[in-house]
């Protein structure tokens, strides 16, 4: 999960390595954080006019707004992580077993 990008909707992506948290914007403290970030020029609105459903907190102090639910974003992250695990290079031992059996490991 350290590299790559996360699709946050409408062909917009964010670097996975910069994400600190993904939260719902419904609570008063998060709404206050969003307002302050906007005042300070640290808000990125990627909702394309849709309802804000997730606020993504980043390392640099920026907040990125998304129209995609936090649960959906997290499941996309988990899918990406699982795919990375499946595409990891196989070990030498696994390659030998694959050659012997003629099947994929």
From Swiss-Prot:
Residues 78-105 have a biased composition (Acidic residues). It holds the Pfam family RemA-like. InterPro entries: RemA-like. Residues 76-105 are annotated as: Disordered. Coiled coil: none annotated. Belongs to the RemA family. NCBIfam families: PRK04323.1. This is Putative regulatory protein COPRO5265_1186.
């Amino acid at each position: 999960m350290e590299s790559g990008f996360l699709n946050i909707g409408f062909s917009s992506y964010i670097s996975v390595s910069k994400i600190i948290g993904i939260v719902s914007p419904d609570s008063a403290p998060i709404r206050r954080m969003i307002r302050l970030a906007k005042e300070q020029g640290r808000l990125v609105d990627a909702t394309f006019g849709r309802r804000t459903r997730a606020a993504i907190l980043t390392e640099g102090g920026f907040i990125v707004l998304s129209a995609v639910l936090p649960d959906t974003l997290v499941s996309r992250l988990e899918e990406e992580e699982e795919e990375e695990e499946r595409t990891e290079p196989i070990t030498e031992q696994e390659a030998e077993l694959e050659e012997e059996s003629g099947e994929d490991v």
